[in-house]
Curated annotation (Swiss-Prot):
It comes from Mus musculus (Mouse). Keywords: 2Fe-2S, Apoptosis, Electron transport, FAD, Flavoprotein, Iron, Iron-sulfur, Metal-binding, Mitochondrion, Oxidoreductase, Transport. One of its GO terms (biological process) is execution phase of apoptosis. It holds the Pfam family Reductase_C. Belongs to the FAD-dependent oxidoreductase family. One of its GO terms (molecular function) is metal ion binding. This is Apoptosis-inducing factor 3. FAD binds at residues 201-205, 235, 240, 270, 467, 514. The keyword Electron transport applies. It is found in: Mitochondrion. The lineage of its organism: Eukaryota, Metazoa, Chordata, Craniata, Vertebrata. SUPFAM superfamilies: FAD/NAD(P)-binding domain, FAD/NAD-linked reductases, dimerisation (C-terminal) domain, ISP domain.
Length: 605
């Protein structure tokens, strides 16, 4: 560590994309957006891109009056591997000591403001305790998702065994940092039927792909198209906050897309992909050519096929308008939710204080049974029953009855008749890939798009990501899986963008998801399909527990409530490549009464 602060010397920023020798003849995008035969020099070496070609106008170095400086502790106050929040007057900073070095970072996760001091420090990064996002402690950069922004990194100096931090006042208050991005310099942008990168689907995967391309220096045309009428938004929040408005859910403001030349096509439905001519056809007849294509169409919710299926006031929730209409119709009235998965249970929880009655219909014996197991499912079911939710289990809807075309009753196969003014369906989804059936792009028997570790389809130059894909899950021996989670879509979108630029990145992240019901958060990491045992530490009745899901001798997933940061800890261990054995958990259960999880740092087997 240096003994004083100094203004950094100007540097020439260069972005270099180098293909391996064997790959240099292939047509990959360079950071300029051109195909490699044009974007690379004749001798096969990479072109260098200078800062002035791609960066926004740099901010001036903060003047002394714009900064705050404070001595926060003695070097011996923190052990290696410890974190502490320290106050600088204008805001707090996360101070980290790792391998004898001190690092100062923003103290809140930019995703939803979790205090990172309560997270997990491991392998040179800190993992958020709430949703699992990871940040490099040396740079502040976002390394694993969810979220879009990174942390600010502040200057640290050591003098006479004292640790002093210097930080910009503005950075302390913002608590998030958007990475430097290229701007579009293509003369044809917005005025041509051709594009370098076309992204079909503007969810998490599509947006992260576009942003990653710009972060990596790609300065040619990017077009992002969506069926929605809105700019990209946090769809995962719809079922948790039915009153949320589009502007509240927006992931980026419209000025962001304008500033970085990411063109948006809203209410744009793709009907055909012509891979031979690298062309996409839209429903209105508009056509766009592409050099690289990302397919991130997401999924379509399943609907009922019973008698009366077309009556009014029966909803699937895909847009803010859907959510808002459900809330409006449910206020003071009778709501029925079909399906006790995450979406259905989140909607039911939200409506308990708004509707006159809330009923849940489910084919299984308990909510979440296949995902969380019988015991955890029953504990959560009891929480809902204590909040006035009525369950009708091991049955399904046989008829929807209407009066003057509007829903009045839901009839179950058990012959039970439920009064209903509004019905929400949460019975699963199917990949929205019908437009690809005649394209030559591979689909499996269920309609998913199979991709490899680099998010490549069977067609060169065509990538896929998000809810509509199956991919090899690295830490489960490359088992082909579909994981329709918000965090996973982020990660896949980044890998797709990196491989459009020939960076040979591979998808390698531990699935992480969460939900919130009645003010309580459930967190989950791993991939637990096929678990054969559940080991529970804590108190299910008090909803303070951690559940380890095992298959044979290995922990394959973990879930918790009021037990942070255990899920982030397990996720970090699994991400490191270390297996957690069932016997480790069993021994912990036998000998530990404290809830201490330090055993997870052991070497294991």
């Amino acid at each position: 560590m240096g003994g004083c602060f100094s203004k950094p010397k100007p540097v020439e920023l260069k972005i270099e994309v180098v293909l391996p020798e064997k790959e240099r003849g292939k047509e990959e995008l360079s950071a300029s957006g051109k195909g490699s035969p044009r974007g690379y020099q004749g001798n096969g070496t990479a072109r260098h891109f200078h800062a002035e070609e791609r960066l926004p106008t740099p901010q001036p170095y903060p003047s002394p009056q714009d900064c705050v400086e404070a001595t926060v502790c003695h070097v011996k106050d923190l052990e290696n591997g410890q974190m502490r929040e320290v106050e600088l007057g204008w805001g707090k900073v996360l101070l980290v000591k790792d391998n004898g070095e001190f690092h100062a970072l923003g103290h809140k996760c930019p995703h939803y403001g979790a205090p990172l001091v309560k997270g997990v420090l491991s392998r040179g990064r800190v993992r958020c305790p709430w949703h699992g996002a990871c940040f490099n402690i040396s740079t502040g950069d976002l390394e694993d998702f969810p979220g879009l922004d990174s942390l600010h990194k502040f200057q640290v100096k050591i003098e006479k065994e004292k640790v002093t931090i210097r930080a910009s006042k503005q950075a302390l208050q913002l608590q998030r940092r958007t990475k430097v991005m290229a701007k579009c310099i293509s003369p044809s942008a917005g005025h041509s039927s051709s594009t370098n990168v076309l992204i079909v689907g503007a969810g998490a995967a599509g947006l992260v792909c576009a942003e990653t391309l710009r972060q990596e220096g790609f300065s040619d045309r990017i077009v992002l198209c969506t069926l929605d009428r809105h700019l990209p938004y946090d769809r995962a929040k719809l079922s948790k906050s039915l009153d949320a408005q589009p502007e509240q859910l927006a992931l980026r403001p419209k000025e962001f897309f304008r500033a970085y030349g990411i063109e948006m096509l809203t209410e744009a439905q793709v009907v055909t992909v012509d891979v031979r001519n690298k062309k996409v056809v839209f429903k209105d007849g508009f056509k766009l050519e592409y050099s690289k294509l990302l397919l991130a169409p997401g999924s379509s919710p399943k609907t009922l096929t019973c008698k009366g299926k077309d009556v009014e006031n029966v909803f699937t929730i895909r847009t803010p308008e859907d959510a808002n209409r459900v809330l409006r119709l449910a206020r003071g009235r009778n709501a029925v939710v079909v399906g006790a998965g995450f979406l259905g249970m989140e909607v039911a929880a939200y409506l308990t204080e708004k509707a006159h009655s809330v009923s849940v219909v489910e084919l299984e014996e308990t909510p979440f049974r296949r995902f969380l197991g019988e015991r955890v499912g029953r504990a959560l079911m009891k929480m809902f029953e204590n909040n006035r939710v009525k369950f009708y289990m091991q049955t399904e809807v046989s008829e929807l009855r209407a009066q003057e075309g509007k829903l009045q009753e839901v009839v179950l196969k058990s012959s039970k008749v439920l009064r209903a003014d509004v019905c929400v369906l949460g019975i699963g989804a199917v990949p929205a890939t019908g437009f690809l059936r005649q394209s030559g792009i591979g689909l499996d028997s269920r309609g998913f798009i199979p991709v490899n570790k680099m998010m490549q389809t069977n067609v060169p130059g065509v990538f896929a990501a998000g809810d509509a894909v199956t991919f090899p899950l690295a830490w489960r021996n490359n088992r082909k899986v579909n994981i329709p989670h918000w965090q996973m879509a982020h990660a896949q979108g980044r890998v797709a963008a990196q491989n459009m630029l020939a960076q040979e990145a591979e998808i390698n992240t531990v699935p992480y998801l969460w939900t919130a019901m009645f003010g309580k958060s459930l967190r989950y990491a791993g991939y637990g399909e096929g678990f054969d045992d559940v080991i529970i530490q804590g108190d299910l009745e008090e909803l303070k527990f951690v559940a380890f899901y095992t298959k044979s001798d290995e922990v394959i997933a973990v879930a918790s409530m009021n037990y942070d940061p255990i899920v982030s800890k397990v996720a970090e261990v699994l991400a490191s490549g270390r297996a957690i054995r069932k016997r480790e958990v069993e021994l912990f259960m036998l000998h530990s009464k404290t809830g201490d999880m330090s055993w997870l740092t052991g070497k294991g087997s």
